[in-house]
Amino acid sequence: MSHNDTIVAQATPPGRGGVGILRISGLKARDVAQEVLGKLPKPRYADYLPFKDVDGSALDQGIALWFPGPNSFTGEDVLELQGHGGPVILDLLLKRILTLPGVRIARPGEFSERAFLNDKLDLAQAEAIADLIDASSEQAARSALNSLQGAFSARVNHLVEALTHLRIYVEAAIDFPDEEIDFLSDGKIEAQLNGVIADLDAVRTEARQGSLLREGMKVVIAGRPNAGKSSLLNALAGREAAIVTDIAGTTRDVLREHIHIDGMPLHIIDTAGLRDASDEVERIGIERAWQEIEQADRVLFMVDGTTTDAVDPADIWPDFIARLPKNLPITVVRNKADITGETLGISEVNGHSLVRLSARTGEGVDVLRNHLKQSMGFDINMEGGFLARRRHLQALAEAAEHLEQGKAQLLGAWAGELLAEELRLAQQSLSEITGEFTSDDLLGRIFSSFCIGK
């Protein structure tokens, strides 16, 4: 498929609605207007017109908007037809447009891809369109809009510009080694480098916040049967999401709930009780539980407080702790405090957090909610934030690593050439975020996840 083709797609969700929009972009958009509307509308004015079939009969009537390139979303000629939102009407109109030569259905995300290729958006802004559509909370939506308006890109471009100036200074020091002043050791380059590193650290902190807003944290509730895992899921979700009985092994599959705590998304996963099971279905559920545990950001180790007084996870169930992935954060949740009479609250035991609560009555659950929020390092008061994806975090981490390596070369051996190379690699990593240095394969993966009409 060529980017020279004219593309068309429905820009509104499928199904019935008050309004249905078809978007056309490309060189043939002008021809589509002449054939379907009988005229070319005045640029950027709403024109109420009939939409005509091949034989001149009306298929529908509605609003036509004409945006001649390059002053359009894609940078190409764009025509939008806003008609009635019935699927049959829209399908007839779409088929009519596709009878014209050189016009085809758009691929997912192709409108945004063309906007990127025509320098109307950088890659981070294009991704923010999808993030804005997928936002699951008000704060995520606001942060996605900030990214779309260029907040994230501006921070990255500032770093790239600072690296460019630093590279010029370093290259000059390399090219003129006979100067009386040793530019590499006079402290100026080190000071500038430290400034860039500090700025990058600040961006990484904000990006981690943005990633939390977009991705959320995956929390798995695990423990023995009848410890109260499903009751805790229901308490956190605020609804009866899981069946709760006194029968051990009631939960046999993975149950997922998506919740928010002060705008922070959490993926709460209830799992089958862990034990040696003879039942084949339960055994499969237990294996799935372990798969979820291995991919978790945090495990809530659910303990029935009526069965043990132990508080150290290694004392409660050493085999379970031994099987957990290394460095996986654990929060011990001693349940049934309404029966044991334990004091509700949170404490620390050998480096692990311990929460005492009653999932059945809900007492102490707010303490757990606050603990989960704090464990993520989420700052609800951070203003002007932006959303970030995992690839953004990786690119920022790679840039930080190159800068640290460059600093080591500067201070350890005054190796200007090696410093210059590390600065170049850091700049390249940062430029991957906005798409200045990005492979075609990555572009394909990013835009293929978009809606068809975007």
Curated annotation (Swiss-Prot):
It is found in: Cytoplasm. Residues 216-377 form the TrmE-type G domain. Its main location: cytoplasm. The keyword Acetylation does not apply. The keyword Repeat does not apply. K(+) binds at residues 226, 245, 247, 250. Its cofactor is K(+). PANTHER family: TRNA MODIFICATION GTPASE GTPBP3, TRNA MODIFICATION GTPASE GTPBP3, MITOCHONDRIAL. Belongs to the TRAFAC class TrmE-Era-EngA-EngB-Septin-like GTPase superfamily. TrmE GTPase family. This is tRNA modification GTPase MnmE. It comes from Salmonella paratyphi C (strain RKS4594). The gene is mnmE.
